[in-house]
């Protein structure tokens, strides 16, 4: 069935494309109609886009397009096909997705290829438009940027951005259509481009990557595209730009080419703009519509921000794998250890007799902590997984290991999910006289969190201060071989170019808060750091799960890999909670394996209050239980 669709991405008056565009709804059993159109019209490039179900990440709609025709395909009817017809459909789809005479073109082509391979069990060959014209830095182009460069400067960039974060069927179709328009404008570049080819990887690797990327898509679908901003003031600077003074770091207006900033007055007057710069608590906004007269009462950000450095590094790794630029997914022993393990003989654990004499800090640890330190120092345990309940001395155990590495001049990087987690490790290392440096992003530090680092300011390096001058970087590091940062900082391209990995190679990687980190975040890092030979993961899977676990239940932390459970270490003594409370937690949460050492032993330190009549009430972005609050006040007054 044919109809028409009108696009609003490229102004019609430019005469670049035909209006309206023919739209054909095609069932998965009629893929041959697309093949016929490609053959009959000698189509050189076919744009492609897809939509995934927010429930389970399966592909429900695929759009194929030329500059004049869009074919909307529903894949949801595949399961209803009889055997022979399903085979025929698969054959047609395979010929379409692997056609060497007609280039499939898409933004994030690696993702598209993995999703189609997983859903349809067919191999895909295509071209990634986002990196087709990348410069020397390899930064990918957004659809709006590439349309501006290759189609016309007057394209509607904000509408193009919106088409890529919205998932209405029309948006899916227009994404495929614009991909085709851009591809058709550069036939020579398509012919010489590196191809994304699923045949570059074995099926087991493709399935693994497809499953991991499905989790990512589910998480991205949950991200808000409308965020309210808390602000202190809005002023006009000498260049005519608005300056927002943000009140909260968590919802600050960030510099972005892909989002729109909406400022509203009490009378409904609206100003729209783009956040073009950010410094500390202030964000500069270039006004695109409306006049500023003061009295701003509400600020919101519409759209989806650019990927982080870590997200770009992850996606770039997957793209290079499928293009054949990386020889194998499993060239890192740590990728093999996590996702493709081979049977390993159980490592014997020595007693460490005599070590206490030459390591006083080790002598002060309990036996479970000593066992972990010995494993971290051992050459025959490349992966050390440590389950540490609260108050069991995880950070202290890490510090003792680092103290020895620091004494021997052996480099180690210590990372955590959050800046606060990294800072807490730094405080412990100071007590152990470990020489270290801590790298913090300018965005997090300046004006927002400088007070957190006052006691370690001389050890702090701002990431933006690491310049590509080997002498200056060496001066800043100052001989330190222990480096602290967040897991995302390891993907910052500034660290790659400044030479810090030459001065302090990533040979040992210690991860705190590992139970809150999706293991997929490490895959590209394992491949990146070829000298890595020791990985130590600390966390507590009984506490906070990684963000998004409810949305993507198949997400795994290191503690979800069953083959590590028999050899994982357990820190079995807690020192933080009074003994009665510790024993209760041990019995209810840790299978009675957690011992308690504390000066408070009396049962009166614990009170249980029945609040079965309580109910959660929504308060802003959080929840409260009024009955609990009343109970807390009552108990406090006893």
How would you describe each model-predicted region?
Residues 418, 488-490, 503-638:
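Conserved helicase motor core of SF1/SF2 NTP-dependent helicases
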Residues 390-392, 397-430, 437-440, 569-574, ...:
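Conserved RecA-like ASCE P-loop NTPase motor core of nucleic-acid helicases/translocases
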Residues 144-204:
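Acidic, Mg2+-coordinating catalytic module of metal-dependent nucleases/exonucleases
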Residues 1-45, 198:
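N-terminal accessory regions of nucleic-acid-interacting proteins
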Residues 356, 410-416, 420-509, 518, ...:
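Conserved P-loop NTPase motor core of helicases/translocases
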